[in-house]
Structure formats: structure tokens, C-alpha cells
Amino acid sequence: MSHRKYEAPRHGSLAYLPRKRAARHRGKVKSFPKDDAKKPVHLTAAMGYKAGMTTIVRDLDRPGAKAHKKEVVEAVTIIDTPPMIVVGLVGYIETPRGLRSLTTVWAEHLSDEVKRRFYKNWYKSKKKAFTKYVKKHSDNNGAAITRELERIKKYCTVVRVLAHTQIRKTPLKQKKAHLMEIQINGGSVADKVEFGHGLFEKPVSIDSIFEKDEVIDVIAVTKGHGFTGVTARWGTKKLPRKTHKGLRKVACIGAWHPSHVQWTVARAGQAGYHHRTSVNHKIYRIGKGDAEDSAATEVDVTKKKITPMGGFVRYGEINNDFVMVKGSVPGVKKRVMTLRKSMFVHTSRKALEKVELKWIDTSSEFGHGAFQTPAEKKQFQGTLKKDLAASS
């Protein structure tokens, strides 16, 4: 073999094995940021729904870079984040084998959209969930609930709230809300319990958890591609054109001995629908979707909403709070995203840069998108035949 390379690193990482379908549809937070008792009490994560992507223009503020003080065009993702409702509190004890939950305290009133989470078939069920538990709040002025909260204060080191999304406020057809544990960081354990208990049955908006220019992580399940071949799945080299019996294959899958195929060999199989954590996404904007100027900037003062003309394709309109993050995030549109505070303190100039947007694209996602607002389109096209028919 002439001109053979002396080294050929393997194709594809073995760090993410097994490449199989995720066990859960919702992105799970496997670790929360380190707690610091000196900081004020705060929540560390939230959930939202991926609406789509758009384009922004801004001036780069990065001294030393070639593009410093020049316009840059960047892709951003819009995540629909209706306020989450806190419905419970969980206390954890540290043991030699990790965290163990001591007890869970639930709120008195739970909406149907979160109760659906506890049923396989809501339509046929008797809907009796939490009917016995609710009596604890009324018996002896909630003495049992108070006792459990005191136990958490006495024995626990980690406190998390149970919060669910308000999925009915989104354009999605699904009625079952997503429920997750959100760790409370900062302050003493007693402060954490009081903070969490004070949030019971109350909405928690996204701007009370994250802020503009913060760097966050997005946890989600990636887009599924089904059963794919080895070339698409692992990125192995295609064989020469004249190869017998196919060329999108691995030519040698191992030696004679050991007489089995090793686990490190690239094979065909499931691609996508994997649980992934995408780190270091900078928040460019947190806004209200129903505000008339949610996509306006200091340079482009046009009154326009963040929803593009005709809505986000395969999602719809955003009428709640939203988060605009830099770049793309895992998963398809409509998929639930878990947003988590970063695991460490960022010190780089890139992470600490203050972002000022100059323009946000709100043109239609269908076609070439020539117009930013319906008014601009009408002004350009003038009076149409359909307008005359409607007026007559």
C-alpha cells in the first residue's frame, strides 16, 4: 500500500457508548452546580421548549480579535419558557454511597396537567392521585407537613424543589406537564427549606433564575435518526469505488483471535435520540414573547415580536417568556429542554463579554424571507386583489 499513513486515529468517540435510545424523553440533570452557603438562596435550573432558530447581528466586543468592533452574524436558538409551578420539596441526606432522599413534601393543590404525569391513561383513570395526601394539610393545621419540613431542616444537606412546566401555555398538543427536581443553592439548609416552601403553588419565571449574558448548559435528547449504517453513525472512511458487496462498510471488523467482535469496532445501529448535555451557551436575551417590541433593539427600533412572520415552523407562536441562547442546542423543535446554571465560574473574556444586539431576524422561515413585519410586506406589495374583494 503506497503512501500509507503511519497512524490512523480511530473514527468516532467511545466516550458516549452505548449509542442507544435514551431511557427518558426529558433531559435529566445528573449534577448541579456546587453549593455556596455565602451566596443568596436561588434555583439552579429550569425547563423550556425548543421553538426554533433565527439570526442576529451584533458588534463583537473582543479586544485583540480581528473582528473586534465589527459586525458579526450569529445563529441563535429561541426556547419557549412559560413560568414553572413549584409543587413539592425533597430533602437529601449524604451517605457513604451518595445522596439518599429522606422525605418529600407536596403542595396542597396540584393542577391536572401535573397529575397526568402519574397516570398511563388519564381518560380511563379515577383521578384519585393525592386525594389522601391533601388531608395532611388540613388535619391539625398541617402538623404532619410542618413535621416533615422540620425533619428536612434537621437532617438534610441538599434541598430540591419539585417544579413542573405549564405545557398548556405552549402551542403543543401534549397535555401532560414535565416534572423535575431543581436544586436550591445558597444560604443555610433552613433558608433553603423556607425559600422552597414559600414558592409552593407559585409561578417561577425564567428571569428569576437566569440573567442576560449568563453562560448556561442545555440538557436534552438529540434528534433521532433510527437505524443507520456505520459510515453515517461513526464517520468511518468509505471504501474504494470497486469494492465488492458495498463500500459504506468497515472492511475488517477484527482479527481471527480473539474470536469475537470487540466492542470498540464501529458497527451499524441506532443513531440519534441520545441524552446529551451541551455546555457554555451564552444568553443573548430574556424577554416576554407577547411584548410588541420583544425583537426590537437600540439600532432596529421597529416594533416586532420575537415570533417570525407565519410563526416558527413546526412550533407556532411564542406568547410566554423566552430565552435566546447562542448557537444550536440538542433536540428537535417542540422537545423539552432542561436549562442549568454552569457548573463552574467563567473567567474568560469571551464568557464575560457584554452582548448588545443590533438586529434580530423575524422574516418568514418559509421561502426567502424578504420582509420583517406584516406592515413592511403590505407597504411593499400595495393593495392586492384579495384586499379589494374583502373590502367590497
Curated annotation (Swiss-Prot):
Keywords: Cytoplasm, Ribonucleoprotein, Ribosomal protein. Gene3D superfamilies: 3.30.1430.10, Ribosomal protein L3, domain 3, Translation factors. InterPro entries: L3_arc_euk, Ribosomal_L3_dom_3_arc_sf, Ribosomal_uL3, Ribosomal_uL3_CS, Transl_B-barrel_sf. One of its GO terms (biological process) is translation. It is found in: Cytoplasm. One of its GO terms (molecular function) is RNA binding. One of its GO terms (cellular component) is cytosolic large ribosomal subunit. It comes from the Eukaryota. PANTHER family: 60S RIBOSOMAL PROTEIN L3-RELATED, LARGE RIBOSOMAL SUBUNIT PROTEIN UL3. Belongs to the universal ribosomal protein uL3 family. Component of the ribosome, a large ribonucleoprotein complex responsible for the synthesis of proteins in the cell. The small ribosomal subunit (SSU) binds messenger RNAs (mRNAs) and translates the encoded message by selecting cognate aminoacyl-transfer RNA (tRNA) molecules. The large subunit (LSU) contains the ribosomal catalytic site termed the peptidyl transferase center (PTC), which catalyzes the formation of peptide bonds, thereby polymerizing the amino acids delivered by tRNAs into a polypeptide chain. Component of the large ribosomal subunit (LSU). Mature N.crassa ribosomes consist of a small (40S) and a large (60S) subunit. The 40S small subunit contains 1 molecule of ribosomal RNA (18S rRNA) and at least 32 different proteins. The large 60S subunit contains 3 rRNA molecules (26S, 5.8S and 5S rRNA) and at least 42 different proteins. This is Large ribosomal subunit protein uL3.
